[in-house]
Amino acid sequence: MKYLHFFRSHLAGFSFAEEVFVFDQLKIWTELQLVLEPENPYDAHAVALYFKKTKIGYIPRVNNKEISKLLEAGYADLFTAKINRISPEEDPENQIGVVVFLKVKGKK
């Protein structure tokens, strides 16, 4: 499958989630699931990122408005998110880098 770059960012909220239990399992290019959280009390456009069944953080607020609208409209299958940077020595909010891609259907 071919992918088009949509945006790149750090993983927000990393220090508040359950990620400490899965940090050692995270690798470069690990695929993450994008999950819309419209009832999030802190951000109506919140998009959580999951590794397997563990929430490890969020798409930062500065990047989430467009993608949250597309997820809400039912286009979740067009996106994939992958870890592109792991820096354990950094502050928790900057330890994980994520890139979101658009999947190009029918192309390899």
Can you name each region flagged by the protein language model?
Residues 1-108:
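Conserved active-site motif detector
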